[in-house]
Each structure stands twice: as structure tokens, then as C-alpha cells.
Amino acid sequence: FALLGTHSTRLMLFECVDGGLLRPLDWGRTAYLPDDLSEILKYKGKTSAAFTHMMMNCARAASDFALADQPLTVLDPMCGKCTTGFVALQNGMNAVCLDIDRKDLKEAADYFSNYLQFHRLKHRLAQSSRTLQKTPVPIAEYTFSDTKEHFAADDVRTLMLAEGDSGLVG
């Protein structure tokens, strides 16, 4: 049931106690990163983060990986400004985001760098390039964690932003 509970938005959870009073219940932290990660960046044509979150949880629940202990990796071959990647990171997954539009990827990278700094999350950024079918593909790979302790213990997540044509992969 806990997995099904991730499909919806919940605002508060209470139990009824003596005299009809409501006592707030703690349902535990389910998000790896705060919900604002996929919500702050606004632009025309943006995919709904709430819809993406629901679809990602439906796909995971229907898969053989529903109860996997290790983080999954989500591939978004036409990421735009990375809404799907950011939702994956919120859910504690890794993300590989590919797009042909350099401007969109730069905006996503700048936003994520600022987000990590603002929230004081420990991270590393590695810039590299790979060649796919004789075409150079610039890559920015962020390695980060939700806490300093997890980062020190190498319990990290990654966001890989790659500029290129998804038709080259495969």
C-alpha cells in the first residue's frame, strides 16, 4: 500500500483521538529531494511535474523493479529542460537526460547547479565528452546526495545531462 500511496498528492494525515480531536500523523519522508525541484522552473510547454510523478510511480509499480532496494535510472531521450529528470531525482532515482537543444540543457544545468547551492547539498560536477557514431556528445554529470552523511558514505545519486540526438544512441 505504501507504493500505491505515492501515486497521489497528500497534504496532511490525521488520526481521530478522544473527543473528536485530530492528531497529525507522520507518514515518513518519501521524497529524496524537496518537491520544489521540479516545480520552480517555469516555461511554455512544460510537462506537468505532478503528472510526470504519477506516471513514473505507475510505471515503477507495474515493473519487476517495484520493490528494488537500489535506485533505478530513468532515461529521458528528449528531456527539454529536464522535468522528468528532476522528478526522478525527487524520487531518489538517477536520471540520464538527453536533448539536442543546447540552450534548454544549459538552462536545466544552470538551474540545477543553483538549486544544489541554494539547498546546500553536497555535490560534484564532472564535464566530459563522448563520441557516438563519430559525433561528439558533451556531458555534464552531477553527483550529489540528500545529506552530507550520505555523500560522505558515497550513497549518492547522479544526473547526467547530454547534448545530442537520441537517434545516435542505439
What kind of region is each of these model predictions?
Residues 1-10, 16-170:
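Class I S-adenosyl-L-methionine-dependent methyltransferase catalytic core
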